[in-house]
């Protein structure tokens, strides 16, 4: 089943990005976003250190049946990276809530990956954002999260931000490579690293890590049992960043949540198993948009 996706080799997946053509000015930040297609609304949320580019091939495919919204969190991708602006999960959850209002979306489908999961959950549980369904893909939602590298950066963010560009690039590529189980092509690595390679991007990369804090998931974890919208938990079996046992625990905590584990995929499931993920999401979104 091709679900209108580019069903070619993995090497050709994610080699070209998309320029987000719209901007929302929000609390001094410029938030890049765009909309593709027509139909039931689907909002796709990225994580760290990623951007909406990770979701672009899926958005392009789903646009045949859905209105797909892509956006970059401030501090990421094509959105502003002002050093004076906080980029923590608390701010991003407030922004997502306001974005849904700006788009006049009463209850869209939401698909979230990594940090995007915590952002979507905070918007729903703390700020009243309503969803028709919520798909959580290898998400940050349960403590503990954050690696020893995160803690090292948090304690020395200024030092890391001042590294020579070549040293930063090497560290960045090594860090990102660990998120893929099958390995990244040079073109895929370029899509992921490019936003962080400028002088502004280098500072922004370490700033967002320094502002990572488990309290943002602690504040909502006890509320997962109150979630009433349909939830799908999808995980790469070989996720080295957030182990699959977190998926099992998260699915247990959310009433009625479904769990799907995809073999041969790591944290970057969009790269490692793009067709399998596309089929899973297409089935999920279609079933909840056109219930029998």
Model-derived regions: residue spans:
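Alpha/beta-hydrolase fold catalytic core
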Residues: 1-42, 63-66, 105-106, 279-292
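Active-site loop/oxyanion-hole signature of alpha/beta-hydrolase fold enzymes
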Residues: 27, 36, 69-112, 279
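Conserved HGGG/HGGXW glycine-rich cap/lid loop of the alpha/beta-hydrolase fold
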Residues: 34-78
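Flexible "cap/lid" loop of the alpha/beta hydrolase fold
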Residues: 125, 131-163
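Conserved alpha/beta-hydrolase catalytic His-Asp/Glu region
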Residues: 144-147, 165-226
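Short beta-strand/loop motif that positions the catalytic acidic residue
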Residues: 227, 233-235
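Acidic catalytic loop of the alpha/beta-hydrolase fold
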Residues: 238-242
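Catalytic active-site module of serine/aspartate enzymes centered on a nucleophile-bearing elbow/loop
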Residues: 257-292
């Amino acid at each position: 089943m091709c679900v209108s996706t580019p069903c070619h080799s993995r090497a050709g997946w994610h080699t070209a990005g998309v320029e987000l053509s719209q901007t929302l000015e929000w609390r001094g930040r410029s938030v890049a976003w765009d909309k593709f297609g027509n139909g039931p609304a689907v909002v796709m949320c990225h994580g760290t250190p990623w951007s909406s580019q990770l979701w672009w091939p899926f958005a392009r495919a789903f646009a045949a049946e859905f209105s797909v919204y892509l956006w970059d969190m401030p501090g990421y991708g094509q959105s502003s990276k002002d050093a004076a602006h906080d980029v923590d999960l608390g701010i991003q959850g407030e922004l997502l809530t306001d974005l849904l209002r700006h788009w006049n979306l009463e209850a869209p489908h939401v698909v979230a990956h990594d940090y995007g999961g915590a952002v979507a959950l905070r918007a729903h549980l703390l700020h009243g954002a309503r969803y028709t369904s919520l798909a959580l893909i290898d998400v940050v939602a349960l403590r503990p999260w954050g690696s020893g590298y995160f803690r090292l950066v948090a304690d020395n963010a200024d030092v890391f931000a001042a590294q020579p560009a070549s040293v930063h690039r090497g560290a960045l590529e090594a860090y990102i490579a660990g998120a893929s189980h099958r390995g990244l092509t040079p073109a895929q690595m370029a899509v992921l690293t490019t936003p962080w390679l400028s002088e502004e991007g280098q500072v922004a990369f370490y700033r967002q890590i320094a502002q990572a804090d488990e309290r943002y998931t602690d504040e909502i974890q006890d509320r997962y049992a109150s979630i009433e919208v349909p939830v799908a938990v999808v995980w790469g079996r070989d996720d080295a960043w957030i182990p699959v046992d977190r998926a099992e625990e998260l699915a247990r905590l959310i009433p009625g949540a479904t769990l799907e584990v995809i073999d041969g995929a790591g944290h970057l499931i969009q790269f490692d198993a793009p067709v399998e993920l596309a089929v899973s999401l297409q089935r999920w979104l279609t079933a909840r948009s056109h219930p029998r």
